[in-house]
């Protein structure tokens, strides 16, 4: 039923974040912009709430592929995303600015990668690092770091070109 969609979306995003899996919210995010240069209030809220829920990406489809205002649509979605990320009053809850008392994801480490990546993000936050550098063969380290939502950018290096292209 339609009334369950918002709750199910939040649950799916949360489960993906907990598992360190990238999650994209897509489909009809800015549908009115197929024919109009201005989105509806509900569409702007959908984009913002997807970001606040912890989505790694929001994606357009028909709006940018077939719509009359593709550039304006991409620009508007970008403006909404940046506004939410920069001005959310509880930014530390969104991005894990503070790590005392747990990660907000899962206080029990599943394995050594989980423990080490949490430690790296926690340390980066404590010392005020400007970036986190991840060396990876498969991309797993980068994905696991990103699940903790550090405020620092994650710079990924790999000897395997396909891993970098995938990330």
Question: Can you name each region flagged by the protein language model?
Answer:
Residues 31-53:
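Catalytic cores of alpha/beta
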